[in-house]
Amino acid sequence: MAKRSIKSETSPELQLGRPVTAPDSPETARLDRVPNPQKDTDYLARFTVPEFTSLCPVTGQPDFAHLVIDYAPGPWLVESKSLKLYLASFRNHGAFHEDCTVAIGKRLATELKPKWLRIGGYWYPRGGIPIDVFWQTGKLPKGLWVPDQGVAPYRGRG
């Protein structure tokens, strides 16, 4: 099967299918987007990231989260390899849970211009307290089915 060359809006060539070094920070990470061939159809796309990591900006200790990103694509789709690299750029980035979660949602909303987007950040306990952070762009398109994010509230051994 012949390779198909897909050009993205953000760069002449996608990162997909090429060796790429991990970005140093979320600010320098590139998100590739491709035209949505179903832009006139309301549907939901979900990315589940069960092993997201970042650093506490105060202690430098690692923080861990389970992210669920739901979006109703508009004119653009996010290319998943570039999303993976963008999310990996947080591994050495110091920010509070709320900032990481909301920054990811806002960056995706800015780049993709979706009809609707939400992100749930389910952070594992630090200091004995789990933090769940939720952000969305506005009202859900009428008639769009959105399943529950499927992440139970944190329960220790109790």
UniProtKB/Swiss-Prot annotation:
Record-given protein name: NADPH-dependent 7-cyano-7-deazaguanine reductase
InterPro entries registered for this protein in UniProt: GTP-CH-I_C/QueF (IPR043133), NADPH_dep_7-cyano-7-deazaG_red (IPR050084), QueF (IPR029500), QueF_type1 (IPR016856)
Source species: Bradyrhizobium sp. (strain BTAi1 / ATCC BAA-1182)
Enzyme nomenclature, EC number: 1.7.1.13
Binding positions for substrate per the UniProt entry: V78, E79, S80, H97, E98
Domain of life: Bacteria
Record bears the keyword Translocase: no
UniProt subcellular location: Cytoplasm
Region entry Disordered, spans: 1-37
Keyword NADP: yes
List of catalytic residues: C56 (thioimide intermediate), D63 (proton donor)
GO cellular component, as recorded: cytoplasm
Reaction equation(s) it catalyzes: 7-aminomethyl-7-carbaguanine + 2 NADP(+) = 7-cyano-7-deazaguanine + 2 NADPH + 3 H(+)
Annotated metabolic or biological route of this protein: tRNA modification; tRNA-queuosine biosynthesis
Protein function: Catalyzes the NADPH-dependent reduction of 7-cyano-7-deazaguanine (preQ0) to 7-aminomethyl-7-deazaguanine (preQ1).
Entries under HAMAP family matching the protein: QueF_type1 (MF_00818)
Gene Ontology molecular function terms on file: preQ1 synthase activity
Signal peptide range in chain numbering: none
Family according to the record: Belongs to the GTP cyclohydrolase I family. QueF type 1 subfamily.
Basic and acidic residues composition bias: residue spans: 27-37
Record key words, sorted: Cytoplasm, NADP, Oxidoreductase, Queuosine biosynthesis
GO terms under biological process: queuosine biosynthetic process; tRNA modification
